[in-house]
């Protein structure tokens, strides 16, 4: 049981920053709501889905020492007892070259989150197709598909996954 909890904590912390950077304007709320995160690269050792809630957030003062002015737009990701805040960094020109048309990504620290048309390939020279139109990637985790939940707190989706 401790291994499963550790996995959930690791995945939620790794993906927290990743997920929260998908849109330049948190108020547009394209990421706001309940999401199911599923690592797609089974060879990297992380399996299983976790449920998270993403909400816009504005830090007023003492904003975690992130060297940004107070009141900078951020996302807050909550999963279980974990909460994480993040902010945006635009991706480099070299990173943009690797994307197919219609996809836009943002990086935060060493991760990125991308948004585009569902059912299309976001990355040039990659076979991965995003089912939902949202995905994240990180060097040590690989690709994580983001899927919007239909039930409150993703409970029905998690139950269906855990029974298979």
From Swiss-Prot:
The keyword Membrane applies. The keyword Lipoprotein applies. Its main location: membrane. It is a lipid-anchor. It comes from the Bacteria. Keywords: Cell membrane, Lipoprotein, Membrane, Palmitate, Signal. A lipid is attached at residue 23 (N-palmitoyl cysteine). It is found in: Cell membrane. A lipid is attached at residue 23 (S-diacylglycerol cysteine). Residues 1-22 form the signal peptide. GO terms for cellular component: plasma membrane. This is Uncharacterized lipoprotein YbfP. The lineage of its organism: Bacteria, Pseudomonadati, Pseudomonadota, Gammaproteobacteria, Enterobacterales.
């Amino acid at each position: 049981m401790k291994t499963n909890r550790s996995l959930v904590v690791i995945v939620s912390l790794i993906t927290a920053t990743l997920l929260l950077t998908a849109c330049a304007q948190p108020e547009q709320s394209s990421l706001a709501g309940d999401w199911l995160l599923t690592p797609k690269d089974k060879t990297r050792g992380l399996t299983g889905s976790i449920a998270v809630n993403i909400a816009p957030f504005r830090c007023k003062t003492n904003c975690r020492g992130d060297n940004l002015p107070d009141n900078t737009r951020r996302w807050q990701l909550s999963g279980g007892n974990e909460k994480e805040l993040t902010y945006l960094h635009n991706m480099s020109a070299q990173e943009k070259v690797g994307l197919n048309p219609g996809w836009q990504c943002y990086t935060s620290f060493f991760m990125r989150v991308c948004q585009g048309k569902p059912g299309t390939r976001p990355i040039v020279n990659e076979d991965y197709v995003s089912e939902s139109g949202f995905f994240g990637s990180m060097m040590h985790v690989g690709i994580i598909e983001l899927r919007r939940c239909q039930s409150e707190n993703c409970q029905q989706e998690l139950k269906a996954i855990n029974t298979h």
